[in-house]
């Protein structure tokens, strides 16, 4: 099911990552001689908020300044790992987290970061072991629970995934990211109404979350609600919404409707739309095969 959704262009979300250029000096400042001074709690909180708000340039600049003044503060090393992870630099993040995973007050978060990084690197077995260690250390580590849910989901261990997502939702006050991830798992299981409920809840928490909106449209289309699935799509998103609806129609073996939707997607694009063209070709071929199969059965 996930492969199909990828072809359809539906957005997937396992862990929220945004990539950007590293701020100069951040990841080299640890080479300075140890400084016994600690950063102010307010400074640490400001850097964390900047990372949480995806203001990575601000976070990088503030972190660089803090490290210059208090390079001995292990909390800053942890934040450097968090910033690397948020930017998609998993290997670099691993190095940072490993430096502080023996610090008692930081161990839970460091193990969580290592586990998420391992998951992003595709080292699934190691990731699961590390993430389980993280939640054993800190049962409220919701990002570790979310990543565990994603790992179990990938392996179609639905019961464990459901339990992990439940922990993540409880400890994160119903994070929209976790709601979206659980919704996509349920979509994969054809639990369409439950998936739609999760996507709607995610959008209520974060109305500007495109992955949840795209997944909601896909779930509606999978129910055969094609018009509803593309209703309200912005002009720049309409072609993709129609393509996704068309692919959902293919999965439903509704080939005639699929061809109509995919043709509309190509027109809405205003130019060549390779994905919609490939899906249209697939719909036509499957329709031909289906008709031929039906004819064979009728002759028997």
Would you name each region that the model predicts?
Residues 51, 85, 112, 119, ...:
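Position-specific recognition of the canonical hydrophobic site in helix A of tetratricopeptide repeat
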Residues 79, 113, 147, 181, ...:
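Canonical tetratricopeptide repeat
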Residues 21-78, 86-87, 95, 292-300:
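N-terminal leader/linker segments that initiate helical-solenoid repeat arrays
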Residues 54-61, 87-99, 121-133, 155-167, ...:
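Structural signature of tandem alpha-helical TPR/SEL1-like repeats
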Residues 40, 74-75, 107-109, 142-143, ...:
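Helix-start (N-cap) detector for alpha-helical repeat units in TPR-like alpha-solenoids
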Residues 26-32, 235-300:
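Terminal, low-structured helical/coil segments at or just beyond the last alpha-helical repeat
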Residues 69, 102-104, 137, 171-172, ...:
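Structural marker of alpha-solenoid helical repeat scaffolds
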């Amino acid at each position: 099911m996930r492969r199909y959704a990828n072809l359809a262009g539906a957005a997937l979300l396992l862990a929220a990552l945004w990539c950007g250029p590293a701020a100069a000096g951040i990841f080299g400042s640890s080479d300075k001689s140890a400084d016994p001074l600690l950063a102010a709690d307010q400074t640490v909180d400001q850097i964390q908020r900047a990372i949480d708000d995806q203001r990575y340039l601000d976070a990088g600049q503030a972190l660089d300044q803090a490290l210059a003044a208090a390079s001995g503060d292990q909390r800053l090393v942890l934040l450097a790992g968090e910033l690397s992870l948020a930017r998609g630099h998993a290997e670099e993040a691993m190095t940072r987290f490993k430096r502080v995973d023996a610090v008692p007050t930081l161990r839970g978060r460091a193990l969580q970061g290592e586990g998420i990084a391992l998951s992003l690197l595709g080292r699934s077995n190691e990731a699961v072991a590390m993430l389980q260690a993280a939640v054993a250390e800190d049962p409220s580590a919701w990002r570790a629970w979310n990543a565990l849910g994603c790992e179990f989901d990938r392996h179609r261990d639905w019961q464990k995934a459901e339990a992990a997502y439940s922990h993540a939702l409880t400890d994160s006050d119903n994070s929209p990211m976790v709601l979206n991830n659980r919704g996509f798992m349920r979509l994969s299981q054809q639990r369409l109404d439950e998936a739609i409920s999760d996507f709607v809840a995610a959008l209520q928490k974060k109305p500007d979350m495109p992955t949840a909106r795209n997944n909601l449209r896909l779930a509606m289309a999978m129910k055969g609600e094609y018009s509803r699935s593309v209703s309200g799509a912005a002009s720049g998103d309409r072609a993709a919404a129609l393509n996704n609806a068309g692919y959902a129609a293919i999965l439903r073996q509704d080939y005639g409707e699929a061809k109509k939707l995919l043709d509309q997607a190509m027109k809405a694009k205003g130019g060549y739309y390779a994905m919609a063209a490939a899906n249209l070709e697939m719909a036509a071929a499957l329709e031909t095969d289906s008709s031929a199969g039906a004819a064979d059965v009728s002759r028997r």
